[in-house]
Amino acid sequence: MINQANNQVNFSEQQFVHHKRFSVIRLTFSVAAIGILFIFLIGFGVQQLLTNTTSLGTLASDIRTLGTIAFVASLVSLILYFVTAFKLRNRNTTLAWFWGLIIADVISYGITLGVLLTLATTQLRELIDFKFSDIVFAFLGAALVYGTVWGLSALPSQQRRYQQTQTLFRIFIWAFFISIIASLLTFVLNFTVFRGGRTNILDLLFPGLSLIVGGIFSLLSVYFVCLQIRNEQDLVKLYESQDPALAKAQMWRSALFFGAWLVSSFMNLVYFILRIILLTRNLSRAF
């Protein structure tokens, strides 16, 4: 009787994982979709808050305050990415770490989106030639790019996919250290040579280089996360035959971590496309 009950429990666990074998992929995209939904909710909330501001001076002050909050949230998110990356394979890790990562991402991108919506729907849009339709086109473009890259990520074989993710991971590690050095150099230049001005070390070397580099790494990040989501699916499938409970736990850790990364890479792609739209408009006006 006891053995029969134990077998039933094991069967229900296996049935859960087998039924959810789409789990990592579908659950990851579900987490990302919910995250983007909350980004929109926060964005519209921030827009309503800023739209009620009576003067441009107060509006600028509020935008700076919200920008500081968004920066702090993005910094917390960056720290949590490193912490949770090392905890991703630890079966004893609580999911609170991964939920915290998603929440920090949603707050950061939600506030940024809210500021953009405010710029596109208030009297400020006349000053910077920025429209609400630009944001819509940026989101549609990012969705199209992401869908295309997701399809391309299915082409490599399993072994080739693992090799590509390892190569991209090394590139991201080096890029992280280079970006830290570039940020420090920019910070020093802004408070010494340029006396409080704002510049970018890449744009000093070659105008527009920061946009090009940002675009390349946005696409690489999208491709990497698409490959890795498929790798996580393979891993959970392996765990399924050995330990269904472990497979279930790993499914949630993977879905939350890479769901957050998917949100981050998607929103970065949106902002990159938005910069392209604005740059193209400014160039067309110049000529």
Swiss-Prot record:
Q: Does the keyword Transferase apply?
A: no
The annotated topology with respect to the bilayer is: Multi-pass membrane protein
Q: Which domain of life is it from?
A: Bacteria
What stretches pass through the bilayer? 27-47, 66-86, 97-117, 135-155, 171-191, 205-225, 254-274
* A GO cellular component annotation in the UniProt record: plasma membrane
The UniProt keyword set, sorted, is: Cell membrane, Membrane, Transmembrane, Transmembrane helix
Q: Where in the cell is it found?
A: Cell membrane
Q: In which broad location class does this protein mainly occur, judging by the first location in its UniProt entry?
A: membrane
Q: What is this protein called?
A: Uncharacterized protein MG320 homolog
